[in-house]
Swiss-Prot record:
SUPFAM superfamilies: Homing endonucleases. Residues 274-308 bind DNA. Keywords: Cell cycle, Cell division, DNA-binding. This is Probable cell division protein WhiA. It comes from Staphylococcus aureus (strain NCTC 8325 / PS 47). Involved in cell division and chromosome segregation. One of its GO terms (biological process) is cell division.
Length: 314
């Protein structure tokens, strides 16, 4: 089962009172529902590919409106041959849509009805219904952080974005070919949203994975930084040894001033050690990294003069 499916499974088990059930149903039916006419009778069909979401729709409609609901199962004929679940009720169809703020004076509305988001709990319930209807979230173990809710209508996507941003989630929306999506990209905001709609088990799993990923990324950055520094140190040491060998060949290390002669010999004998360690091996007492670096630069400058055929003064 995918992370998103596990999360939806958890959300469908949340107990809600009648008002919050209506808010959740309002989102579910507005986003996944359709009204049809059969035998001169209005029929509500609410479609989903998630079995637990279908059971949730079934139980909420039955409980809140005390009407008969049936669940039909169809096989999807496209590439992914998943089941499609259709929750259908032929009773009080117009009354249900009126009460959920979906139908106004016989006209379908795309905006979120204010009566469905009167207080904090109802707003959370509406967002939960919206996620159950059209939401998806990437598995945090295998991909980048991304949560989105698909809406067929742009004005509803805008309303969702505004509703989510009332909780400072930094949600954004954009148009797609067959509708619009409202999405979150920041891991912290996704965590906040999971908590907001009651997905606490999903939140714990998401946070566990996020902590491990962040730690792994930090370690990788540290290793990369240390590797780069090591490569830089090795490259500098090789250049220093090359310069010292040239000096020894052309004028002899023994002819160098004492402080340059000693550091030259230590560097050739200990090519792998750092400037700090070089400074600690000087016989006259430890010298600083900058002091060691200054002497090695002198040797490099001297080697450059030899390469360029310049006059050497020791």
């Amino acid at each position: 089962m995918s992370f998103a499916s596990e999360m939806k499974n958890e959300l469908t088990r949340i107990d809600v009172d009648e008002m919050n059930a209506k808010a959740e149903l309002s989102a579910l039916i507005r986003m996944n529902g359709a009204l049809s006419l059969s035998n001169q009778q209005f029929v509500i069909n609410v479609q989903t590919e998630n079995a637990t979401t279908a059971r949730r729709i079934y139980s909420l409609i039955k409980r809140v409106f005390n009407v008969e609901v049936e669940i039909l199962v169809r096989k999807k004929m496209k590439l992914k041959k998943n089941n499609i679940y259709i929750c259908r009720t032929k009773m009080k169809a117009k009354e249900i849509l009126d009460e959920l703020g979906i139908l106004k004076d016989g006209i379908f509305t795309h905006e979120i009805d204010h009566s469905m988001i009167q207080d904090d709990e109802m707003r959370r319930s509406y967002l939960r219904g919206a996620f159950l209807a059209g939401g998806s979230v990437n598995n945090p173990e295998t991909s980048s952080y991304h949560l989105e809710i698909f809406s067929q209508n742009e004005s509803h996507a805008e309303g969702l974005t505004k509703l989510m941003n009332s909780y400072e989630l930094n949600a954004k929306h954009l148009e797609r070919k067959k509708g619009s999506i409202t999405y979150l990209k920041e891991a912290e905001k996704i965590s906040d949203f999971l908590s907001l709609i009651g997905g606490y088990q999903a939140l714990l799993k998401f946070e566990d994975v996020r902590i491990v990923r962040d730690m792994r990324n930090s370690v990788n950055r540290l290793v990369n930084c240390e590797t780069a520094n090591l490569n830089k140190t090795v490259s500098a040491a090789m250049k220093q040894v090359e310069s010292i060998k040239l000096i020894d060949k052309e004028i002899g290390i023994e002819n160098l001033p004492d402080r340059l002669r000693e550091i030259a010999r230590i560097r050739v004998e200990h090519q792998e050690i750092s400037l700090k360690e070089l400074g600690e091996m000087v016989s006259t007492g430890p010298i600083s990294k900058s002091g060691v670096n200054h002497r090695l630069r002198k040797l490099n400058d001297l080697a450059d003069k030899i390469r360029n055929g310049e006059q050497i003064e020791l």
